[in-house]
Amino acid sequence: MTAPHTLGQASPADREGPVLRLDGLGWSVGGATIVEDVSLSVREGEFLAFIGPNGAGKTSLFNLISGLSLPTAGRIELDGAEMTDRPAHVRARRGAGRTFQTSSLWPAMTVADHVRLAAQAARGGSYRLWRRADPYTAEVAGVLERTGLGHRARATAGELSHGEKRKLELAVLLVGEPRLMLLDEPMAGVSAEEVPALTELIRTLHREEGRTVLMVEHHMDVLLGLADRLAVMHHGRLLALGTPEAVTADPVVQQAYLGEGL
């Protein structure tokens, strides 16, 4: 078993009690190993970013953490509770929330109704979007203001720009008040003009609201301004883990990603 190349200052996760702990996590399908022997801990309030080329296993690892896939090896703990074989909805109740590379929004539904539906699901309410008495109005308005979408409440998802859609996905996620946010390529499809505002929103959720964030992203300039640590995935394994400065300057990482732009 080969440990990842650890760089920079070590995380104090083990001392403080991690929000997330992975121990020897692996996932194989049809004889092919997709994720192999990944071990790490994430402390509360930390921002850990995952980088690596397409096919490195980053999204597959997120699927294992969120419960969309179940590992074939290893162990997962969320906030001290074992979640290795638990389904996604149990992990969500434990505080793990997830966004995806591909949007799952309904084009004809309004921005406000997306958030309202999420609030009803999170609070155990019935799915009656158009009833006269709506106990979620204040909550919906508050979440939309936090994510910069208050002025777009009545617009449909299909009318939004890519950046606004990513903000709406974050708004839907925030309704559940997740302690651990897994963001899978939130900048995908977002225009260069919209990247700074979306980056600032994610920074606010992390630093001002104190949320723990795991993020997969290919925009290195974005990650270098957000992440406390970088995790480098390579052929399904955790190649390196450390501060952004140490990881991007490391010869092992540079050799593995020669031509990948690191």
Language-model regions: role of each:
Residues 51-53:
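The feature captures the beta-strand-to-loop junction immediately N-terminal to the Walker
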Residues 66:
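Helix-to-loop junction immediately C-terminal to a conserved catalytic motif
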Residues 181-185:
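Catalytic Walker B motif of ABC-type/P-loop ATPase nucleotide-binding domains
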